[in-house]
Amino acid sequence: MIDNPLKNVSIIILAAGLGTRMKSNMAKVLHNIKGKPMISHVLVSACDVAGENVIVVVGHQADLVKEACLKMSSVSFALQKEQRGTGHAVLCAMPEIPETTENVIILCGDVPLLRAGTIRALLADHVKENRELTLLAVELEDPTGYGRVVINADGELTRIVEEADATQGEKSISIVNSGIYC
């Protein structure tokens, strides 16, 4: 077990998406919350945990997103030229991860209320349980619109299914994907 799991951690922040559900021409992560771009709140927590080992994946309005990020921290960037999903965005960031990294945390750039303590707790649990992958999920009374977390009889994650692709049975699942992984 790693003595200090925070020592060799990198964080990837996904900020390349179009944010089409917001019905705005502005990149979703640039919308202001409490006078700052949404992504700046995520960066505060990420940098508190990983220092300068933070990689922001940019795409839509990349230059504006980079500008907003650099106003408040020293981070690296990876460009996702085509928005081809979360997995592809992570692949775009992988070359920027330092070789000394032992754990990678993946965050969405649109979770401004995420606290550094939550990230640390997720990582500590991930390391303690010696998992290959940890997904932060939440149970909602009304999960409409969210990706469902499908778990087998052994309590293992089998897949994440988006609402549009879910069967009626899967739509009844109340555990949803937060988009936060380790």
What would you call each of these model-derived segments?
Residues A15, V58, C108, A137-V138:
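Short beta-strand/turn micro-motifs composed of small residues
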Residues D63, S73, L114-C182:
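Conserved core of the sugar-phosphate nucleotidyltransferase
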Residues V9-I33, V49:
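Glycine-rich N-terminal loop/short-helix segment of MobA-like nucleotidyltransferase
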Residues M1-V9, P37-C108, P112-A124:
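Conserved N-terminal catalytic core of the sugar/cofactor nucleotidyltransferase
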